[in-house]
Design a protein with these regions (language model features):
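Extended, low-polarity transmembrane helix blocks
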Residues: 1-31, 60-65, 69-146
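Membrane-interface interhelical connector segments
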Residues: 33-55
Length: 146
């Protein structure tokens, strides 16, 4: 395949992954900051141990901070223009690795409350993130001159 086409595909794949995770964590984290703890949160998690430790408010804000950190990492990757040939995708890979832990947090809450459909969805997000991380690590290295 033509090396210019390969570089375009690499850049497009990394940019799309970067923008997707920037969007996912940006909307999730910023909406939590803007709206605060939702009214349903106590009803869903109030009967779990999370109500005692670390507490529902702390649980909500720890999740929010986790999402905002993923958003910030994705933002740094985009600002560094890691999707271009000259840059290794260090912050993009960090975004994806951290996202695995955020999806783990989200999935834990779903499984804890016996929301098995939600838990399965988080499992699929986790799996998709693993695929994205593999792609970013595989194509995320700068192209070598021949």
């Amino acid at each position: 395949m033509n090396s210019n086409v390969q570089l375009f595909i690499r850049s497009a794949a990394l940019l799309a992954i970067n923008l997707l995770f920037l969007m996912v964590w940006g909307f999730a984290g910023i909406s939590k900051v803007m709206d605060g703890v939702p009214s349903w949160f106590d009803g869903k998690f109030g009967k779990t141990f999370l109500a005692s430790f670390p507490g529902l408010t702390a649980t909500f804000w720890l999740l929010t901070i986790s999402e905002l950190l993923a958003f910030a990492l994705a933002g740094v990757a985009l600002v560094r223009i890691e999707f271009l040939r000259q840059r290794p995708a260090v912050f993009l890979c960090a975004t994806l690795a951290w996202s695995l832990f955020v999806f783990l947090q989200l999935g834990f809450g779903q499984w804890l409350t016996s929301d098995f459909n939600g838990g399965f969805q988080q499992f699929m997000y986790f799996t998709g993130t693993l695929v994205a991380l593999h792609v970013a690590q595989s194509v995320g290295r700068p192209a070598q001159a021949n």
